[in-house]
C-alpha cells in the first residue's frame, strides 16, 4: 500500500517541478503574435528614434518635435519585426537646423506647444539593417 502512495507522490512532485521550470504563458513568443514591447530594449529605442526622425522629415514645421511620452509600444515578429507605437510628441523651441535636437526644451506657451497624438507602424529587418515607416497617423492632442 505504501508503494503506490510513494509513486503517486513522486509523480506529483516531478510534475510540479516541470511546471515550475516551463516557460510562463507571457514568456512564450509566437510568430505573428503582437506583444507589449520593452521600452528599455535597444532595438525598441532605435525604432522610436527612427519614428521621430521620419516624423520631423515629413512635417513642414520649422521647429523640431520630440517625444513627450510613449502611450503604448508593441511588437510583432514576422519576417522581421513590426513595431506599433502610440506616442505623444511636442514642439520644441529649436529649429530643425540646430544641433543636439534631442535635448531641446519644449515650448512653454500653450499656443506654441502644438502637441500631437500619433500612431506609427515601423517594419525592421535587423539582419539587413533596414527600417521603414509603414503607417503613420497624427492628430492634435
From Swiss-Prot:
Tissue specificity statement from the Swiss-Prot or TrEMBL entry: Expressed in submandibular and sublingual saliva but not in parotid saliva (at protein level). Expressed in submandibular gland and parotid gland.
Any single GO BP term:
detection of chemical stimulus involved in sensory perception of bitter taste
Q: Where is the signal peptide?
A: 1-20
List, alphabetically, the CDD domains matched.
CY
Instruction: Specify the superkingdom.
Output: Eukaryota
Disulfide partners: 94-104, 118-138
What InterPro entries does the record point to? Answer: Cystatin_dom (IPR000010), Cystatin_sf (IPR046350), Prot_inh_cystat_CS (IPR018073)
Location(s) in or outside the cell? Secreted
Key words, A-Z: Disulfide bond, Protease inhibitor, Secreted, Signal, Thiol protease inhibitor
**At what residues does the UniProt record annotate the site feature described as Reactive site?**
32
Task: Give the chief site where it resides.
Answer: secreted
Matches recorded under Gene3D superfamilies? 3.10.450.10
> Which intervals of this chain are the motif Secondary area of contact?
76-80
Stored SMART domains = CY
State a GO cellular component annotated for this protein: vesicle
The similarity comment for this entry is: Belongs to the cystatin family.
The protein's role, per its UniProt record = Thiol protease inhibitor.
Record's protein name: Cystatin-SA
Amino acid at each position: 500500500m505504501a508503494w503506490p502512495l510513494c509513486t503517486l507522490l513522486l509523480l506529483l512532485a516531478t510534475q510540479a517541478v516541470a511546471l515550475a521550470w516551463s516557460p510562463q504563458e507571457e514568456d512564450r513568443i509566437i510568430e505573428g503574435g503582437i506583444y507589449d514591447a520593452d521600452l528599455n530594449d535597444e532595438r525598441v529605442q532605435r525604432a522610436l528614434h527612427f519614428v521621430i526622425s521620419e516624423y520631423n522629415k515629413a512635417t513642414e514645421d520649422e521647429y523640431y518635435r520630440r517625444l513627450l511620452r510613449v502611450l503604448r509600444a508593441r511588437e510583432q515578429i514576422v519576417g522581421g519585426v513590426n513595431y506599433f507605437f502610440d506616442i505623444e510628441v511636442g514642439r520644441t523651441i529649436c529649429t530643425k537646423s540646430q544641433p543636439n535636437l534631442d535635448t531641446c526644451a519644449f515650448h512653454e506657451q500653450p499656443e506654441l506647444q502644438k502637441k500631437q497624438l500619433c500612431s506609427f507602424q515601423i517594419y525592421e529587418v535587423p539582419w539587413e539593417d533596414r527600417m521603414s515607416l509603414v503607417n503613420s497617423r497624427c492628430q492634435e492632442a
